[in-house]
A protein has these predicted regions:
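Short, basic phosphate-binding NTP loop
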Residues: 1-13, 24-27, 34
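Buried hydrophobic packing segments
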Residues: 3, 27, 31, 48-52, ...
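Conserved hydrophobic helix-helix packing surfaces used for dimerization/oligomerization
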Residues: 11-12, 38, 59
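Active-site glycine-centered loops adjacent to acidic/histidine catalytic or metal-binding residues
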Residues: 16-17, 43
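Short beta-strand-centered segment that lines the nucleotide-binding/catalytic pocket of NTP-utilizing
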Residues: 36-48
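Flexible active-site lid/hinge loop adjacent to a nucleotide/diphosphate
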Residues: 55-140, 145-158
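A conserved, hydrophobic alpha-helical segment in the catalytic core
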Residues: 75-87, 158-188
């Protein structure tokens, strides 16, 4: 929230139980290749408030944990993704439902015209979407569609099911930013 009170720049915020760091790092590399002024911040290890030389066109890629989102009241991200949700940090949140609610603050704080990316066919995420007042446009991300994109890619690291899911989100967000898919392939 302190960050948001200083900067009103476009943010791409990634949360979920697994895959946040990988997804953020790939997105960051893709945007750098496309010559965007981009900063990678948040839970990934780069403190948000230590960022320097921020311009109007600077885009922030934010890795957000449930701990960071739990107390958020005003932070808004133009692009927001919830990769997946499985029981985690229950010692902090007390229940899985509280953990889900912390993660969903990211989408609930979005405005009309913002974009939310969620995993297709995820029953937990779908249930929460239906019971929440979400104003942003929702894009369902299907990892099964990434296989065509990954054809002829030799990097076995990205051929695991987990990384296919991560790349599916990167591809979906990249398309909304009008980034050429061949640049994404070069990064991979």
């Amino acid at each position: 929230d302190i960050f948001y009170s200083f900067y009103k720049n476009d943010c791409i915020t990634i949360t979920g139980t697994n895959g946040k760091s990988t997804t953020c790092q790939i997105l960051y590399e893709v945007l750098l290749k496309q010559k965007f002024d981009v900063r990678l911040v948040g839970n990934i290890g780069n403190p948000i408030l230590s960022v320097k030389k921020v311009k109007k066109k600077t885009i922030f890629i934010v890795e957000a944990s449930s701990y960071q989102l739990e107390y958020s009241k005003i932070f808004r991200s133009k692009y927001a993704a919830i990769l997946n949700l499985t029981p985690d940090h229950i010692e902090r949140h007390k229940t899985f439902n509280n953990y889900i609610k912390a993660k969903f603050k990211l989408l609930k704080n979005q405005l009309k015209g913002h974009l939310a990316f969620i995993k297709k066919n995820d029953l937990i995420i779908q249930r929460e979407i239906k019971s929440s007042r979400i104003r942003s446009k929702i894009t369902e991300v299907d990892k099964n569609k990434i296989d065509i994109f990954l054809k002829n890619i030799d990097n076995n690291y990205f051929l695991t099911e987990t990384n296919k899911e991560n790349l599916s989100f990167v591809l979906a967000i990249s398309k909304k930013l009008n980034i050429q898919t061949n640049l994404l392939k070069k990064v991979i």
